């Protein structure tokens, strides 16, 4: 199992696959599957049948999960992809840190 260092709300860039080079915000992290769902990336057309709650059926675009190894975190200060590491602060809190800029991530 891959260690998950990317969190919901992070800006990431796809580094391999059909959407290589595209950037988006992580909507959901599926830790048990080592996958993430990124807004606007890996879209698939799904046919939806009309039901009582949603009268209109039809074809919708839906984001499908991408493996965590196929995305990289985008550093907000340099706007380049970077790796993430964990560091303990003086008050014993464990925080995520950008390796490129050394900036503490939220």
Curated annotation (Swiss-Prot):
InterPro entries: KOW (IPR005824), Rib_uL2_dom2 (IPR014722), Ribosomal_uL24 (IPR003256), Ribosomal_uL24_CS (IPR005825), Ribosomal_uL24_KOW (IPR041988), Translation_prot_SH3-like_sf (IPR008991). GO terms for biological process: translation. The keyword Ribosomal protein applies. SMART domains: KOW (SM00739). GO terms for cellular component: ribonucleoprotein complex; ribosome. Belongs to the universal ribosomal protein uL24 family. This is Large ribosomal subunit protein uL24. It comes from Orientia tsutsugamushi (strain Boryong) (Rickettsia tsutsugamushi).
